Amino acid sequence: MKTISLTTAQIKKLARIAKDTLPNESCAFLLGDNDKVLKILPMRNIDESPVTFSIEPAELLHAYNLAESKGMQVIAIFHSHPAKPRPSSTDLKFMEINPVVWVIYSTTESQMKAYVYDDFVKEIGIRIVDVRG
């Protein structure tokens, strides 16, 4: 995957989720088809930490079941960082076992970036797909 596709409204929603959970990291699953995000599923950070996040296993199972029931996939994991929007050493470990796009939002820089892991971390583009009418 070379890009992940989000609407402006989805980007704003993710930024709002990140800001609403300050000072802690926020997290969400992005459900969709191929590279296009169709649904944002906010998750609770059970770590309640400004530097890490974890999701309750039952909530993870619910997200995967919901995606399957709607004909979608979990295409990305979103979370916020208090600093730069780049993967931490902890993120890198989890990216290896969760081979989806990782979208990171910096609450200090109001900047969002997306990454994939395939033997190494690679930044990918975020494509805005607003429909003009």
Regions picked out by a protein language model, each given a short descriptive name:
Residues 77:
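Conserved, mostly hydrophobic/aromatic
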